[in-house]
Curated annotation (Swiss-Prot):
GO cellular component terms attached to this protein's record: plasma membrane
PANTHER family in the cross-refs: NADH-UBIQUINONE OXIDOREDUCTASE CHAIN 4
Listed transmembrane segments: 5-25, 35-55, 87-107, 116-136, 137-157, 170-190, 203-223, 249-269, 278-298, 315-335, 336-356, 373-393, 409-429, 456-476
Main localisation: membrane
Reactions performed catalytically: a quinone + NADH + 5 H(+)(in) = a quinol + NAD(+) + 4 H(+)(out)
EC number of this enzyme: 7.1.1.-
Membrane topology term: Multi-pass membrane protein
Protein name in UniProt: NADH-quinone oxidoreductase subunit M
Enzyme class name: translocase
Pfam family for this entry, one: Proton_antipo_M
Amino acid sequence: MLELPIISITIFLPLISVLYILLFFNQNKKADKLSIYVAMLSSVLTFISTIYILIEFDVSNNTYQFVERYTWLDKIGLEFHVGVDGIAIFFVVLTSFLTLICIIGSLFTIKKYIKEYLVCFLLMESLCIGAFTSINLLLFYLFFEAILVPMYIIIGVWGGDNRIYAALKFFLYTFFGSVFFLLALIYIYSKIHSFDLTNILELIGNIPLFAQKILWWAIFIAFAIKTPMIPFHTWLPDAHVQAPTTGSVILAGILLKLGGYGFLRVLLPLFPNASQEFAIYVIYLSVIAIIYASLVALAQKDIKQMIAYSSIAHMGYVTIGIFSFTEIGISGAIFQMLSHGIISSSLFLIVGTLYERLHTKEIAKYGGVANKMPILATFFMIAMLSSIGLPSTSGFIGEFLSLLGIYKVNVVTAFIAALGIILGAVYMLKLYKEVMLGEITNTEIKHFRDLYKYEIISIAPLILLIIYFGLMPNSILNVFHLSVENLLIKF
């Protein structure tokens, strides 16, 4: 294995590209074109580096690999301490993959401030990879919260008519959670004098149990907002509806996963006793989210809003899997996060192609699109069927394992949560029928042409992954199997 600081390279490559674009390219069309070349090269190289990490990853080792540790601010315990384990590695790959997809997808759809748009995406890629690889809790916090800035700008500048409201709502919700998280970190450091996760795991017992419960709730709120869980969910539909297409892809595909990842990386291992005590409340909230969000999705008239509420429901399966404290449930939750990242990204890209042609997201304005766009209709069908959990697609594996995990803990809860699959089938099949099938009622649809090459290049890899994950789930599950076992040692 090459002795390269591969994690640092992966984190800082997009950041260096951001600095290069900002420092050397002026605001003109030529600069936009050069920025595209730099962003494409950067995202390709970053993706290659994450694939290298995945190939060289030793699945028989349940500890962190490719570890790097450098002192940053020793007086406050801040170190650049990064590495990957079986849980983190796929989120790192997913981040680089979706960023590349988004940059390709935005080449022909973003018309203003192209250079700045690409800068925001590269910056977000760097910050997300940093968050997924951090082993220092303060470093994780800095990456976790800094992601707010580029996403806020993407929604606020390139979003729809109500973009300012949606961006501000997103900012305030996330900032609200970050305050609790920061206060919890300060208290932990005052007692343990370290932000290193491995040190905190060893010394967390020095903190009184009552204080641990308060810390648990403080950190839980931050991750629940990001997931998002009910009642912290209302920012998501507005953000999705107003965000540009590729902004929605990053939001659903990566940012929502930071909440679930935070539960696995921080909340459960640091506070196992409090997690077990409060798990039942999280499970109840998750089941409510699944049923409530599914019913609300059924009533939506906006395509993106429907998919946004479906995301809340799907992330409900993630949280019930995590807080089942079973190996199969947590494995299902991780798989569900990866699967949802791919499915939701493909759905938002598909909606984006429709919006580029008709400039509306209103379901009633469509109908009969499959007559003019058979390739898109096929992609949409596969993504839709996976979203409702059809066997042999990726959506089935994650939901089934999560439900199986909670079934071992609470049978009634499992059956109620399973109703969400039925409701999901109802609203997704209804959406497909009203948009794709039937006669063409809108004369503008008669002039539609099927997917352009760049659209196929953006969507097709996601569709292939949906099928691959569904047919070969063990190739994914086996990678994080030992890490999940290691996580459950304290339970």
